[in-house]
Amino acid sequence: IGFDATLGYGGHTKAMLQCLQGKGHMYATDVDPEESAKTKKRLEEQGFGEDMLTIKLQNFCTIDEIAKEVGGFDFILADLGVSSMQIDNPKRGFSFKVDGPLDLRLNQQKGISAAERLDTIGREELAGMLYENSDEPYCEELAKAITDEIRRGHRVDTTTKLREIIEKTLDFLPEKEKKETVKKTCQRVFQALR
């Protein structure tokens, strides 16, 4: 009996199912309902049905409950992080490279989007989040710019708007440093908000 903590596209699960050769069962969790449904369908079409695979739409932190339910696991795989499927989809709001809603949630039916979070967060808390979650060296300047924009009545609700604020905030940098610094800063800010 195996457990894949983050089903994603299902590549690891498929490889493990092939190794089991029909003599075992895989359990997999993922919090993304959209990708889980696609992966389930794709694996079923490849011959890996419910008799071999159980997919649970939940966080892998429930592994203890699942293990008790099934009597434990012989092996566990956890490939943690956001998948390229999520990053490449502009509707998910994970990438600063393309315009999309500033969402950043793995499961868009749960919790609040990054844009909604920015609507309610104060300058100090945002600066702390940027520093703590991504070691952002310009955390104070960025927090001020973002919260000032919101205070003026302009929502930061798209990936492009957030990127533009970052670019404007770092406009003081020498031209030869600016492009790379803006890119790295965007990466850190999006990471911190996730």
Please describe what each predicted stretch is.
Residues 1-194:
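S-adenosyl-L-methionine-dependent methyltransferase catalytic core, i.e., the SAM/SAH-binding region
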